[in-house]
Design a protein with these regions (language model features):
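N-terminal helical cap/lid subdomain that shapes the substrate entry/recognition surface
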Residues: 2-99, 107, 118-121
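Generic structural signal for small/hydrophobic residues in well-ordered secondary structure
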Residues: 10-13, 60, 105, 113, ...
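Asp-based, Mg2+/Mn2+-dependent phosphohydrolase catalytic module
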Residues: 1-9, 118-119, 123-205
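Proline-centered loop/turn at the N-terminus of a beta-strand
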Residues: 110-112, 187
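Structured helix-beta-strand junction loops
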Residues: 107-108, 204
Length: 205
């Protein structure tokens, strides 16, 4: 198999840990007193009803204030803008060994982040984890107006990277994204930890 020329890294769950459960706990902490229990017991139904606003936000089709408006309308509450922003963003941990490994590989392989994310989260991560700024480029869903595993996302990413699909390798922790990339001709590995990744990369980089 030919050696990979360009590495494409998923962000959350690969280069940096994050937690959706922490997001909901954060939201509980900023709810008005009488709304907290209602929010807790209805969180699964709320997730479903807020799917469209959240999806639009990740695609860059809705602003942060428009997302907050949608949450307020659904919950019938008024939320402080900065408290909402802090609750929304404070879901990330620190980059670990995989990020350090990615940096070492970047010395010989151009490397890009491909992430389903929004402007708020990406800016927060860049400030919180400047050790990730070694990447040659960042391709977030909100800028290309498409989400992994949609073909449009990968097609746009390849245009930005400027390399043939078969010369690129995606590393992603979501199997559907791996399969979507492969359908577009991109080589892809399902991330299941650093040790397994090193084993699977042997001979490719």
């Amino acid at each position: 198999m030919a050696e990979v020329k360009v590495l494409l890294w998923d962000l959350g769950g690969v280069l940096i840990p994050f937690s959706h459960a922490r997001l909901w706990r954060n939201f509980l902490g900023i709810m008005p007193l009488g709304k907290s229990l209602k929010f807790f017991w209805r969180r699964e139904a709320l997730q479903k009803r807020l799917f469209k606003p959240l999806d639009d936000f990740e695609r860059g089709l809705r602003s942060f204030d428009e997302l907050r408006d949608a949450v307020e309308n659904e919950l019938k509450v008024t939320l402080d803008r900065e408290k909402f922003r802090n609750a929304w963003n404070d879901i990330f941990g620190r980059p670990g060994e995989t990020a350090a490994f990615a940096r070492a590989l970047q010395e010989s392989h151009p490397s890009y982040v491909l992430s389903n994310t929004n402007a708020e989260h990406l800016e927060y991560v860049k400030q919180k984890a400047p050790e990730l700024l070694f990447m040659d480029g960042w391709i977030p869903s909100y800028e290309v107006h498409a989400l992994k595993p949609e073909p449009e996302f990968f097609e746009r990413a390849l245009e930005i990277v400027g390399e043939e699909a078969g010369n690129c390798l995606l590393i992603d922790d979501r199997l559907e994204n791996v399969e979507g990339a492969r359908k577009c001709g991109i080589r892809a590995l399902h991330y299941r930890g650093l040790a397994k990744l090193k084993e699977e990369l042997n001979g490719q980089v």
